[in-house]
Regions:
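C-terminal catalytic histidine-bearing segment of alpha/beta-hydrolase fold enzymes
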Residues: 144, 150-183
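Residue in the alpha/beta-hydrolase core beta-strand immediately N-terminal to the catalytic nucleophile
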Residues: 52-54, 77
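Active-site signature of alpha/beta-hydrolase-fold catalytic machinery across serine-
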Residues: 67-71
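Alpha/beta-hydrolase-fold catalytic nucleophile elbow
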Residues: 14, 56, 81-82, 124, ...
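Mobile cap/lid helix-loop segments that gate and shape the active-site cleft of serine hydrolases
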Residues: 75-114, 118, 130-142, 151-155
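Short beta-strand/loop motif that positions the catalytic acidic residue
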Residues: 116, 123-125
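Cap/lid segment of the alpha/beta-hydrolase catalytic domain
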Residues: 1-51, 87-93
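Gly/Ala-rich beta-loop-alpha elbow adjacent to hydrolase catalytic centers
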Residues: 57-61, 65
């Protein structure tokens, strides 16, 4: 509602699904398709500039923002909070809700974030995050893999990392500044 109050046209989804709707699909695929369909709806609206669509989320929502930004080039600005990490960290300290067959042998999360380049990306992680979760030091390690891609594409100004004073949450002022600047 905060973004809507600021004048943005928003679609707010609740990504709480932890079981498959169809047996031959992956949970992440189903979640991502739902979000892509939201973008499909947005681009049909006369009030929406299709070149100025952003996405944002925290935790599982931050993961889904990562996936949507990576897989749908209509997203021009992605804000992913409480999720910049490594698969090793999540494997040891979190639920398996992020995992699907084969993902670990192919990529790490930094590789998926790299697919957003050269488009705009802001990642946020809280300095008061739980020690076993999405900590700033681990986020900085993942960022070391993302930054060179933005550099190679001459888009370093399109990559932001905000280690904020909070915990597992969105730093609202920096998110608003990011969208005000880029959308």
């Amino acid at each position: 509602t905060l973004l809507a109050e600021k004048g943005y046209i928003t679609v707010s989804t609740k990504v709480s699904q932890h079981s498959l709707r169809e047996e031959d699909k992956t949970m992440m695929g189903e979640r991502l398709l739902d979000l892509i369909r939201c973008v499909d709806l947005l681009v049909t609206m006369k009030e929406v500039d299709p070149k100025r669509i952003g996405c944002a989320g925290n935790s599982l929502g931050g993961e889904m923002a990562m996936w949507l930004g990576a897989m749908d080039e209509r997203i021009s600005a992605t804000m992913s909070a409480g999720f910049l990490t490594t698969m090793d960290q999540l494997e040891e300290n979190h639920c398996r809700c992020w995992k699907f067959p084969g993902i670990r042998t192919l990529v790490d999360f930094a590789d998926i974030y790299c697919l957003i380049a050269p488009r705009r990306l802001m990642c946020q992680n809280g300095l008061k995050e739980r020690p076993a979760w999405f900590t700033v030091p681990i986020a900085k390690e993942a960022l070391k893999e993302i930054s060179p891609i933005y550099s190679d594409l001459e888009a370093t100004d399109n990559l932001d990392f905000v280690p904020h004073k909070g915990g597992h949450e969105i730093d609202v002022p920096s998110m608003l500044g990011f969208f005000e600047k880029h959308l």
